[in-house]
Design a protein with these regions (language model features):
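Mid/C-terminal beta-alpha module of Rossmann-like enzyme folds, strongest
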Residues: 143, 150-169
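Catalytic helix-loop patch of NAD(P)-dependent Rossmann-fold dehydrogenases
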Residues: 20, 27-35, 46, 55-97, ...
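Conserved sequence/active-site signature of Rossmann-fold short-chain dehydrogenase/reductase
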Residues: 55, 102, 131, 166-168
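NAD(P)-dependent short-chain dehydrogenase/reductase
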Residues: 85-132, 137-146
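Conserved catalytic-site loops of classical short-chain dehydrogenases/reductases
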Residues: 5-7, 45-51, 95
Length: 169
């Protein structure tokens, strides 16, 4: 077997649409993750899985710690937490990396929308009921590679880790 690691960045991430498509969201964010974990475990591979801060209720005045109790308030958050739990159940030798406000020049994300609207409109209005740290996808990729490098050095430590860039907006 040549497979040592599986990196899973796939997910149903349309947070608002998830409320209307709970079954599909659960099949992707929980069931597919469980299947991936089972397949990886069967061949002795370790899984590095990307998750989200939506597993929390978002009411903390400080950054969440890995040891904080989860309490998702949305379908998306509940399905991502269910995926974490399913993965650790079938493939406990896994790393889960929770991140927040992920953005890049690719795909759909809040930062790209703001930049596009900034070009189209003279004025932008925002609700300001959330505080968070935007995380560049490239930085998350570097963090995931660091997990692989540690694993190759014999220092793979399964568990849940939080990663985001610095700063707050």
């Amino acid at each position: 077997n040549d497979v040592q690691y599986v990196m899973n960045c796939a997910a149903y991430t349309a947070v608002d649409k998830a409320e209307e498509h709970e079954d599909l969201c659960m099949r992707i964010n929980r069931d597919a993750v469980r299947n991936l974990g089972e397949a990886a475990h069967a061949v002795g591979a370790k899984v590095i899985h990307v998750s989200t801060d939506y597993v929390f209720d978002g009411t903390s005045c400080r950054p969440y710690l890995e040891s904080d109790a989860t309490c998702p308030v949305s379908v998306y958050g509940r399905t991502k937490l269910a995926g974490e739990q399913a993965l650790m159940e079938v493939c406990p030798d896994s790393v889960i990396i929770r991140t927040a406000w992920l953005y890049s020049e690719y795909g759909n994300n809040f930062m790209k929308t703001v930049l596009r609207l900034g070009k189209e409109r003279d004025e932008l209005r925002f609700i300001f009921d959330q505080v968070g740290t935007p995380t560049y996808a490239g930085d998350l990729a570097v963090a995931m590679l660091a997990v692989l490098e540690r694993a190759e050095a014999g220092k793979f430590i399964p568990g849940i880790y939080h990663f985001s860039d610095e700063g707050v907006c």
